[in-house]
Curated annotation (Swiss-Prot):
Official protein name in the record: Ubiquitin-conjugating enzyme E2 14
ATP-binding recorded as keyword: yes
Enzyme Commission identifier(s): 2.3.2.23
Keywords, ordered alphabetically: ATP-binding, Nucleotide-binding, Transferase, Ubl conjugation pathway
UniProt-annotated catalytic positions: C91 (glycyl thioester intermediate)
GO MF annotation terms: ATP binding; ubiquitin conjugating enzyme activity
Organism whose genome encodes this protein: Schizosaccharomyces pombe (strain 972 / ATCC 24843) (Fission yeast)
Length: 155
């Protein structure tokens, strides 16, 4: 079985320590079983969004050659959003293989997740039908998104 490079471990240790010492408001990060390569995260729905009052749990998993490959994100809290699918996948531009660079910090990734909660990006959706509804029938989108928060994101 392959093992992580010392530079991957150092980088993750540094980024994790930075996020614990200087947390991003409304984001919590913890290691899963003391594993630097698997984080459990929680994002609080921004107060100025349809996701206000929700707690959204997700995991960050890092490849052994991080930061040369992007982490994967899996949302475990169901969310009605054009950039998140029902399997927990997230469409985040900076994590796409052709865009991701080693210079991208995890702080930026987490801040962009909060930004997606604040303002969905219907131009780069994972769920085209929700993106279409967001563009063309915003009141219905907002109602369903709020209903999902009440039903799935209040714990």
């Amino acid at each position: 079985m392959a093992s992580a490079s010392p530079s991957s471990s150092r980088r993750l240790t540094k980024e994790y320590s930075d996020l614990r010492e200087h947390p991003i408001p409304d984001i919590r990060v913890n290691l899963v079983d003391d594993n630097l390569f698997h984080w459990a995260c929680t994002a609080l729905g921004p107060s100025d969004s349809v996701y206000a009052g929700g707690k959204f749990h997700f995991s960050l998993k890092f490849p052994l050659d991080y930061p040369f490959q992007p982490p994967t994100i899996e949302f475990t809290t169901r969310i009605y959003h054009p950039n998140f699918d029902s399997e927990g996948n997230v469409c985040l531009a900076i994590l796409k293989q052709q865009v991701f660079k080693p210079s991208i910090k995890l702080r930026s990734v987490l801040e962009q997740i909060l930004q997606l909660l604040r303002e969905p990006n219907p131009d780069d959706p994972l769920v085209a039908s929700i993106a279409e509804q967001y563009r063309n029938d915003r009141p219905s989108f907002d109602k369903i998104a709020r209903d999902y928060v009440e039903q799935f994101a209040k714990s």
